[in-house]
C-alpha cells in the first residue's frame, strides 16, 4: 500500500538513524555524533545525552533503561577511547546516557534495529537477514528467530500481533507476524519519498526518520534529499 509521509519535526541532528517514542518523549539516535536527542511532544529538544555508542543506529526504551544499537566502526566522527569498532547492544542510563551494560549482537555483526517488548528485546541481524527476540535479563539469550527475505533491516516498531521493520534500501516497511514471521502488511514509499531508517509508533501511528545517507561514503543508494527528516506515515 502506498502512503503519504508527513514531515513533522525539524531533525535535531544530522543523521537521525533511530527513533523511539516513550510516553510523551521522542528519543532520536544521531549516527554522526552518537548522541541521543530527547524531544517533547511539540518537537523541541529537552535534553541531549552523550553515549558510548559507536555508529549508532537503533534505539529503544524499556525496563527503566535506554538501549542503543552500536553498529561497529564509526565513519562520521573522530575515534573515542570507548570505541571498539564491533557491534554491541548497549544498556544505558535513561536520563544521562551513561554506560550500564553491553552485549555482543546475536550474529556478532552489525545492528540497525531495536525494540523493547514487555521485558524482551527485538533485534535485527544481517548474517542471516533475521529478526531475533532476546532476553536482556538472561545474558541476551536468543529466544526466537525468524529470517526475512528483504535486505537492510532497520527500525522496528511493535504493533498488535506484529512487528514493523523498515527495509531502507527498498523504501518499504513490512509488518511481520511475531509468532510465525509471515508478512502481514506492507507499506511502500514512493520513489521521491524519504528512505525509512528510524521507526517508532505512537497512538497507532507510525513515525519515521530519514538519515539521508546518500553521498556520505557508505555505499547506500538512498534518495538524494535536501536534509534529514522526522515525520509521520499516513495511509
Please provide the spans of the model-predicted regions.
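Solenoidal tandem-repeat scaffolds enriched in leucines and small polar residues
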Residues: 123-124, 131-148, 154-156, 165
